């Protein structure tokens, strides 16, 4: 028993060593595994913010150009800016046309040129009288528009307000004249024009007698085309042209056309003025005496003064740079 005890003690010693060594060997492995797992976990956590931060610059840089495009694309209304001048031009033309035609109508109805065309149309060929009067009025309108357009070298602000003052002066004068007129003012104007035309006819007949006999007595022959040409360029045509041009020169309608061309679209003023003269002269040629008896020159003059004052008053609400 005593001999076997040492053998058993020797045999149990290695077992005890193994029992002690295995935990010792396992402990470092566990210790190594634990920190490695913790470190791996810790290493995995920090990259997560890094991975989240790395795409952020890309995400920020990516949407920024899109945002810039969204901001700048609607802020460049190229088409609207191109269309605005054309729209303003059309409105300016219409405004000038309406202003010119309305002012010419209220200025020319019952005027001296109106009665000249009316009386000559009752005595001579209407088409010849209308052609001569319209040529004179067309030339006068074009000259007046050129005079008014020449003032555009002056800044528009000055011409705009000067023309406004002139409109107010014309309106006040027309109102005063209309209120002071007698109801028979149109008949007096008509008789005055008749006397003037009678005087012109007497001078024409006297000149014709002084020039000698006609073509038949001299033996000269005139072909048919020459007769047509002489019929168109007849003394009546020349008389209507000269009388209308001289009566219109310095008249209120000429001054009004100059003032309108200085502040409005010149093309609109030219077209509107020509159409207004054509309407008034056409009425005078077709039924001038009847119209002169039906309408009152006093009423037309008062209405004209109101129209002029309305244009002057509108300047208080329209900017000079608006194009109207």
UniProtKB/Swiss-Prot annotation:
Alphabetical list of Pfam families matching this protein: GDT1
Transmembrane segment boundaries: 90-110, 127-147, 152-172, 229-249, 268-288, 300-320
Known catalytic reactions: Ca(2+)(in) + n H(+)(out) = Ca(2+)(out) + n H(+)(in); Mn(2+)(in) + n H(+)(out) = Mn(2+)(out) + n H(+)(in)
Keywords: Antiport, Coiled coil, Congenital disorder of glycosylation, Disease variant, Golgi apparatus, Membrane, Signal, Transmembrane, Transmembrane helix, Transport
Keyword Thylakoid: no
Record's keyword annotation contains Membrane: yes
Organism superkingdom: Eukaryota
Main subcellular location of this protein, as a coarse class: Golgi
Tissue specificity statement from the Swiss-Prot or TrEMBL entry: Ubiquitously expressed.
Family classification: Belongs to the GDT1 family.
Designated name of the protein: Putative divalent cation/proton antiporter TMEM165
Organism the protein comes from: Homo sapiens
């Amino acid at each position: 028993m005593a001999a076997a005890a040492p053998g058993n003690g020797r045999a149990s010693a290695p077992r005890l060593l193994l029992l002690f060594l295995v935990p010792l060997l396992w402990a470092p492995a566990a210790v190594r595994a634990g920190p490695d797992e913790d470190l791996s976990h810790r290493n995995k956590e920090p990259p997560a913010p890094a991975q989240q931060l790395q795409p952020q610059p890309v995400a920020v840089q990516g949407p920024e150009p899109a945002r810039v495009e969204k901001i700048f694309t609607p802020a460049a209304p190229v088409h609207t800016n191109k269309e605005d001048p054309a729209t303003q031009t059309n409105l300016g033309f219409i405004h000038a046309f309406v202003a010119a035609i309305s002012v010419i109508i209220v200025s020319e109805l019952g005027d001296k040129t109106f009665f000249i065309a009316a009386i000559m149309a009752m005595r001579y060929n209407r088409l010849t009288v209308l052609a001569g009067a319209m040529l004179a009025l067309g030339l006068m309108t074009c000259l007046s528009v050129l005079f008014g357009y020449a003032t555009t070298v002056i800044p528009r602000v000055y011409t705009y307000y000067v023309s406004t003052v002139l409109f107010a002066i014309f309106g006040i004068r027309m109102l005063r004249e209309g209120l002071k007129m007698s109801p028979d003012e149109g008949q007096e104007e008509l008789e005055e024009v008749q006397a003037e035309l009678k005087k012109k006819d007497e001078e024409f007949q006297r000149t014709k007698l002084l020039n000698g006999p006609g073509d038949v007595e001299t033996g000269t022959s005139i072909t048919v085309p020459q007769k047509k040409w002489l019929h168109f360029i007849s003394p009546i045509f020349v008389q209507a042209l000269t009388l209308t041009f001289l009566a219109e020169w310095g008249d209120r309608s000429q001054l009004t056309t100059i003032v309108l061309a200085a502040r409005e679209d010149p093309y609109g003023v030219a077209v509107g003025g020509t159409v207004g003269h054509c309407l008034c002269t056409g009425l005078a040629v077709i039924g001038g005496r009847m119209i002169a008896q039906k309408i009152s020159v006093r009423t037309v003059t008062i209405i004209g003064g109101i129209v002029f004052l309305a244009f002057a008053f509108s300047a208080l609400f329209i900017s000079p740079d608006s194009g109207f």
